[in-house]
């Protein structure tokens, strides 16, 4: 048989190289495969699925998986706590309500207040029936009115204190005696020495005063 055209020696070598490399590659992979498997983490179907998902999809899956656990961690409010809160709100609303008395009712209450600021239980019940309110409201009115009158009395006392201080100061100035009598000139132009008042002592006069007193007596 006729042989085909012979290739150049360089081309023949080049064509043989891939065959040798391809024959060597599987052998090297077979040698290194146990080492790579020991170094690389275990690959599971779930991990491959997670790696194939994008980042937003992973976050969404994590939130969905964590959602039930968070909801299960929240404890429902007890009935006692709910009843307590509703009771507090009801008491606050009740406190805000204020009874407005008419002029006639105020006159009646004021009349009894002027008679007695601390009425007895029987009187409180009668007033509550007359006005149409509860006993607690009557007691509260008397209590508030007593506090108002005490405050008014304190203000009157404070206003009266400065006036009393001024009058006492004027009295003290008018009754204040100096330690010595001022010098008085006599008829002939000679000055007379003043007498001094010592503590727990009798007034002392000089000779000229004694002589003038003696002449006056004569």
UniProtKB/Swiss-Prot annotation:
Ranges of compositional bias, category Polar residues: 40-72
InterPro entries listed in its UniProt record: Distal-less_Homeobox_TF (IPR050460), HD (IPR001356), Homeobox_CS (IPR017970), Homeodomain-like_sf (IPR009057)
Chief site of localization: nucleus
Bridged cysteine pairs (disulfide): none
CDD domains the UniProt entry points to: homeodomain
A GO cellular-component term linked to this record: nucleus
Keyword Chaperone in record: no
Annotated DNA-binding residue span(s): 94-153
UniProt-annotated stretches for the region Disordered: 40-77
SMART domains per UniProt: HOX
Tissue: Specifically expressed in oocytes and early embryos.
Subcellular location: Nucleus
Deletion consequences: No visible phenotype; mice are viable and fertile. Female mice lacking maternally transcribed Obox1, Obox2, Obox5, Obox7 as well as zygotically expressed Obox3 and Obox4 are infertile: embryos arrest at two-four cell stage due to impaired zygotic genome activation (ZGA).
Family classification: Belongs to the paired homeobox family. Obox subfamily.
Protein name: Oocyte-specific homeobox protein 7
């Amino acid at each position: 048989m006729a042989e085909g055209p012979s290739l150049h020696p360089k081309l023949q070598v080049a064509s043989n190289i891939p065959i040798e490399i391809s024959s060597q590659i599987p052998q090297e992979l077979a040698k290194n495969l146990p080492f790579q498997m020991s170094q690389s983490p275990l690959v599971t179907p779930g991990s491959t699925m997670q790696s194939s998902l994008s980042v937003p999809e992973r976050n969404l899956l994590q939130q969905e998986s964590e959602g039930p656990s968070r909801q299960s961690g929240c404890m429902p409010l007890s009935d006692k706590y709910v009843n307590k809160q509703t009771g507090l709100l009801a008491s606050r609303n009740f406190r805000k309500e204020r009874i407005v008395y008419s002029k006639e009712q105020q006159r009646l209450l004021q009349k009894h207040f002027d008679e007695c600021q601390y009425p007895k239980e029987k009187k409180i019940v009668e007033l509550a029936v007359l006005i149409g309110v509860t006993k607690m409201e009557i007691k509260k009115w008397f209590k508030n009115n007593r506090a108002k009158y005490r405050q008014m009395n304190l203000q009157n006392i404070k206003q009266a204190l400065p006036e009393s201080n001024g009058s006492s100061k004027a009295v003290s100035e008018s009754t204040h005696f100096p330690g010595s009598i001022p010098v008085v000139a006599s008829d002939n132009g000679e000055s007379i020495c003043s007498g001094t008042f010592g503590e727990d002592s009798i007034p002392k006069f000089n000779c000229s005063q004694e002589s003038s007193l003696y002449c006056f007596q004569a």
